[in-house]
Amino acid sequence: MNALQKFHHFFNCCIGAWHTERTYHYLDRGEVERSRTDFTIRTLTPELKEKVLADNNYPNHGVDGFLGFHLAFETVSEKGEEAGQELNMLFVPRREGPRGLEGDYLRDRAYEEDRPIVASFRFDPGSLQLVMTTTYTRVVAVDTITLLNPRLRLRQILTYQRPPHGQPLEELLLVGFGVEQKLT
């Protein structure tokens, strides 16, 4: 399988219902929080793919080859706090290089800010690892999903203070880890 075929395989494995247990380390305030999340992933229709492109003012190149998904999740923290969200996302491969497949990751709603957003992704076909990097107004989120097998994923979330333009990511605010198990 080439990189694009492995990318499709990765997401075919991700479609369905999942349960995750996560631990978040808030380094800026010295707190640790545990939570559990149930989420579902399903494919997007061509019409919804086009809407995600339009919401982000992204050039429409035809959506047939783009992988698009609807994500819905409900999270409960160990303190009993509940949060949920639904969003549509689209992955637009731009190039294949020595580090794998790279491209744009579009959402109709961002996690940190309630607006459409274009981020970047990199997919390593050897390790079946997807890294998504989103630059928000105040922070930069680096979210990594590693598919260990079709029913088990590892998740890592790193959130940095957004540095001045052109400067490296240095000030880490949050580190999160999760084990995600497929239910259906």
Curated annotation (Swiss-Prot):
Checking CDD domains in the record gives: lipocalin_CpcS-CpeS (cd19433)
Give its E.C. classification number.
Answer: 4.-.-.-
Name of the top EC class for this enzyme? lyase
Task: Give the record's keywords alphabetically.
Answer: Lyase
Listed InterPro entries: Calycin, CpcS/CpeS
* GO molecular-function term, one example from the UniProt record: lyase activity
Q: What Pfam families does UniProt report for this protein, alphabetically?
A: CpeS (PF09367)
**What's the family?**
Belongs to the CpcS/CpeS biliprotein lyase family.
What exactly does this protein do?
Covalently attaches a chromophore to Cys residue(s) of phycobiliproteins.
Protein name (Swiss-Prot/TrEMBL)? Chromophore lyase CpcS/CpeS 1
Organism of origin: Synechococcus sp. (strain JA-3-3Ab) (Cyanobacteria bacterium Yellowstone A-Prime)
The upper taxonomy is: Bacteria, Bacillati, Cyanobacteriota, Cyanophyceae, Synechococcales
Gene designation:
cpcS1
